[in-house]
C-alpha cells in the first residue's frame, strides 16, 4: 500500500477519501498531513482571535484503527466548536488509536470529556477521553549532587536551546546537596522535545557523567472554584529531624488553635486547618521562612480530579470503591483528609513496591483483574526514591496525562490467563494454627531491583530504560525495553544498549525481562538469593568480554519504534493496603517521533 506519510492535503489515496473530501467541503476546514499526524483545522475558517488557551485540548484514545475524521468530527461538533483535531497516523494509512481535539474554550473541553469518555463509538468499542496538557519540562537524572542550581542552569543552556528555568530540590538528608536530578523548563513543548532528542543517553555527558532524560509529568491543574475551598497546606524541604510538634507550633504561631492536625513524612508534611482563611494566612506568612535551619516551601494542596485519577484501597476487597475527599499535591502525593495520612505518596521508592509480596488490581470495567501482580520499578522510581516538588515527576511521554486505566487501543491490563496457584485440601492434611508474623518473608526481589543494586554497588550509575514497540503477526502490540547503564555505555559504546532478543505482550513483563537479560549478559544470577550481590564485583570485570546476541532476530530494527503513544508505556500503580492506583499515559511529541 502506498505510504500515507506525506505532506499535502492529507486526502489523496487515503482510506475513505470520498467521505473525508465531503467533510472538508461541508465544513470548510483544511485537512493536511505532516509528521505522522493529520491535522483538521487549526485555525478553523474565519477564526481571527488568538488560539484557545491551555486546557482546551482533549485526548481521545481507544479509537478503532479504521475510524477517521468523517466519524469523529460530527461527534465532537455536537459538543462545541472545534478549533483543531490532530489524528495520529501510521504508515499504512490507519490511525494509531488516538487523536487530540482542541475546542474553542475550556467549558466545551470539559463537557467533551464528560460526554465522550466511555462513549460507544462502535459496537463494543468505548472511547477513552481525558484532558491533554502541553509539557515543556524535562526530567534530567544523573546530575552530581554537589552542583548548584546556577551551575545546572548554565550547563543546560550550553547544551540545549530555549531553557527558561531549572528546578532543583535539596537532598532530604543533606540540604547542601541536590537529589541527583533536576527539572528543566523550556520555552515551548517543541523546544523541550528537541532538547530531549539531543540529550538521549550516550550522546551528551554533563560534568563527565552520563545522564538520563525524559519528560516530567505535568502538574495537576485544578480549577479556581475547587481550589477556593482547600484548607490543607503542603510543606516541603523540611529537615528530617523536624517533628510534627515543631511544625504545628510554628503554624499555630500565626493564629493560635488554627491547626487541626499535622502529618510529616520524611522531609514534607501536610497541615490541616479548621478554615481556609487561616490556611492562606499561614501560607503567606511562612512560605520561604527558615524552620529548624531549612527554608520551607508552603503551598495549597490540590484536590484530585475524579475524572482522571482514581484511588482504591485493599480494604475494599477488590471491588474498587472510590474514596472521597482525596487530595493530590504539586509533588504528586495523594492524601485522604478524612483519615490520617495513609502511608506512601504516589511516586515512591521502588523498594517499596518490590518488597511487597502481593499487589492487587481492583476489578473494574473488565480492564483490571484482582489477581496478584508485582510491578517492576520504573526509571522514575529508581531516581526518585523520595517524593519531588512542584516541578512534577519524570513522566512517560511527550505530553503527559493522568488518566483512568484502560485507555489506548489494544493495551488493557487484564487478568493473567494462567491458572491460579491454588491447591486442594487432601485427606489426611493437618491444618495447624500459626501466627503469620512468624512466617519467613516470601517476597522476592525483581530483576529491575537487582540490576539497580548491582549498578549502585559498582558505581555504574542508574540503569536507563527505553521502551520500544512492534506489531506482531497477529496485529497485537508487543513491547521491548532497551537498557543503558551509563558507566558501561561510556566504556563500551559499541555494544550498548542492552537489547533483549524477545518481545513481551505487556509493558511490565518487558521491563522485567529486559532487566533479567541484562543481568544474564553481565553474568549475574537473577534469583535474588544470597549469591546475587556476591557476584556483583565480578560483573565489572566480566562485562568487557561478554557476547552480544542478535537481539533483533524476531523483529527487525526497522519495525521497532520508540513507544511514546498512549497504551505503549502505561504504568499501572497497583494498590496494597493504601497505595494509590492510577495510570500514566503518554503522547508523541508531535514532531515526527512516533
Swiss-Prot record:
How is this protein organized at the quaternary level? Part of the apolipoprotein B mRNA editing complex with APOBEC1. Interacts with TNPO2; TNPO2 may be responsible for transport of A1CF into the nucleus. Interacts with SYNCRIP. Interacts with CELF2/CUGBP2. Interacts with RBM47.
Q: What is its main location?
A: nucleus
Q: Name one Pfam family in it.
A: RRM_1
Q: CDD domains in the record, alphabetically?
A: DSRM_A1CF, RRM1_ACF, RRM2_ACF, RRM3_ACF
Record organism: Homo sapiens (Human)
Query: Which GO BP terms apply?
Result: chromosomal 5-methylcytosine DNA demethylation pathway; cytidine to uridine editing; embryo implantation; mRNA localization resulting in post-transcriptional regulation of gene expression; mRNA modification; mRNA processing; negative regulation of nuclear-transcribed mRNA catabolic process, nonsense-mediated decay; protein stabilization
Q: Which GO terms describe its cellular component?
A: apolipoprotein B mRNA editing enzyme complex; cytoplasm; endoplasmic reticulum; mRNA editing complex; nucleoplasm; nucleus
Cite the effect that the entry attributes to residue 183 to A.
Greatly reduced RNA binding
Impact of altering residue 59 to A?
Answer: Greatly reduced RNA binding
The gene name reads A1CF
Q: Where in the cell is it found?
A: Nucleus; Endoplasmic reticulum; Cytoplasm
Q: What is this protein called?
A: APOBEC1 complementation factor
The alphabetized UniProt keywords are:
Cytoplasm, Endoplasmic reticulum, mRNA processing, Nucleus, Phosphoprotein, Repeat, RNA-binding
Amino acid at each position: 500500500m502506498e505510504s500515507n506519510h506525506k505532506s499535502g492535503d492529507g486526502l489523496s489515496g487515503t482510506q475513505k477519501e470520498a467521505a473525508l473530501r465531503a467533510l472538508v467541503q461541508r465544513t470548510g476546514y483544511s485537512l493536511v498531513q505532516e509528521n505522522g499526524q493529520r491535522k483538521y483545522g487549526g485555525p478553523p475558517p474565519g477564526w481571527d482571535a488568538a488560539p484557545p488557551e491551555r486546557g482546551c485540548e482533549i485526548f481521545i484514545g481507544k479509537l478503532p484503527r479504521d475510524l477517521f475524521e468523517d466519524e469523529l468530527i460530527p461527534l465532537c461538533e455536537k459538543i462545541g466548536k472545534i478549533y483543531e483535531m490532530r489524528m495520529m497516523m501510521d504508515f499504512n494509512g490507519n490511525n494509531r488509536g488516538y487523536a487530540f481535539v482542541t475546542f474553542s474554550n475550556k467549558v466545551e473541553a470539559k463537557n467533551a470529556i464528560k460526554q465522550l469518555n466511555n462513549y460507544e463509538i462502535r459496537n463494543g468499542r468505548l472511547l477513552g477521553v481525558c484532558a491533554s496538557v502541553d509539557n515543556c519540562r524535562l526530567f534530567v537524572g544523573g546530575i552530581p549532587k554537589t552542583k548548584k542550581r546556577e551551575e545546572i542552569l548554565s550547563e543546560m543552556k550550553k547544551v540545549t536551546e530555549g531553557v527558561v528555568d531549572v528546578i532543583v530540590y535539596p537532598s532530604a538528608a543533606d540540604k547542601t546537596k541536590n537529589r541527583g536530578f533536576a527539572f528543566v523548563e523550556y520555552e515551548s513543548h517543541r523546544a523541550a522535545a528537541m532538547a530531549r532528542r539531543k540529550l538521549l543517553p550516550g550522546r551528551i555527558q554533563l560534568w563527565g557523567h552520563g545522564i538520563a532524560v525524559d519528560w516530567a509529568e505535568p502538574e495537576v491543574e485544578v480549577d479556581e472554584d475547587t481550589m477556593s475551598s482547600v484548607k490543607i497546606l503542603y510543606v516541603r524541604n523540611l529537615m528530617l529531624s523536624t517533628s510534627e510538634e515543631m511544625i504545628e507550633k510554628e503554624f499555630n504561631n500565626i493564629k493560635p488553635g488554627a491547626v487541626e492536625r499535622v502529618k510529616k513524612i520524611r522531609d514534607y508534611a501536610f497541615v490541616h486547618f479548621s478554615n481556609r482563611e487561616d490556611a492562606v494566612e499561614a501560607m503567606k506568612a511562612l512560605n520561604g521562612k527558615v524552620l529548624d535551619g531549612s527554608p520551607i516551601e508552603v503551598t495549597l494542596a490540590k484536590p484530585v480530579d475524579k475524572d482522571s485519577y482514581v484511588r482504591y484501597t485493599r480494604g475494599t476487597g477488590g471491588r474498587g470503591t472510590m474514596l472521597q475527599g482525596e487530595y493530590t499535591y504539586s509533588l504528586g502525593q495523594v492524601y485522604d483528609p478524612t483519615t490520617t495520612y495513609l502511608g506512601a505518596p504516589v511516586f515512591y521508592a521502588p523498594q517499596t513496591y518490590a518488597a511487597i509480596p502481593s499487589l492487587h488490581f481492583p476489578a473494574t470495567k473488565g480492564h483490571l483483574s484482582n489477581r496478584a501482580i508485582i510491578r517492576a520499578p520504573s526509571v522514575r522510581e529508581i531516581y526518585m526514591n523520595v517524593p519531588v516538588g512542584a516541578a512534577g515527576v519524570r513522566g512517560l511521554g511527550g505530553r503527559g496525562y493522568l488518566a483512568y486505566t484502560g485507555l489506548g487501543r489494544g493495551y488493557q491490563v487484564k487478568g493473567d490467563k494462567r491458572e491460579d496457584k491454588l491447591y486442594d485440601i487432601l485427606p489426611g492434611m493437618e491444618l495447624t494454627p500459626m501466627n503469620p508474623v512468624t512466617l519467613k518473608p516470601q517476597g522476592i526481589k525483581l530483576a529491575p531491583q537487582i540490576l539497580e543494586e548491582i549498578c549502585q554497588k559498582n558505581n555504574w550509575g542508574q540503569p536507563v530504560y527505553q521502551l520500544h514497540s512492534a506489531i506482531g503477526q497477529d496485529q497485537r502490540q508487543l513491547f521491548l525495553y532497551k537498557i543503558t547503564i551509563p558507566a558501561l555505555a561510556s566504556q563500551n559504546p559499541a555494544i550498548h544498549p542492552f537489547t533483549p532478543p524477545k518481545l513481551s505482550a505487556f509493558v511490565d513483563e518487558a521491563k522485567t525481562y529486559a532487566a533479567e537479560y541484562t543481568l544474564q549478559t553481565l553474568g549475574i544470577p537473577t534469583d535474588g538469593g544470597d549469591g546475587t550481590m556476591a557476584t556483583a564485583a565480578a560483573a565489572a570485570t566480566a562485562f568487557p568480554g561478554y557476547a552480544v546476541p542478535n537481539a533483533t532476530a524476531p523483529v527487525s530494527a526497522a519495525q521497532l519504534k520508540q513507544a511514546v503513544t498512549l497504551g505503549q508505556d502505561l504504568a499501572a500503580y497497583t494498590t496494597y493496603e493504601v497505595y494509590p492506583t492510577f495510570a500514566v499515559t503518554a503522547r508523541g511529541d508531535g514532531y515526527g517521533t512516533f
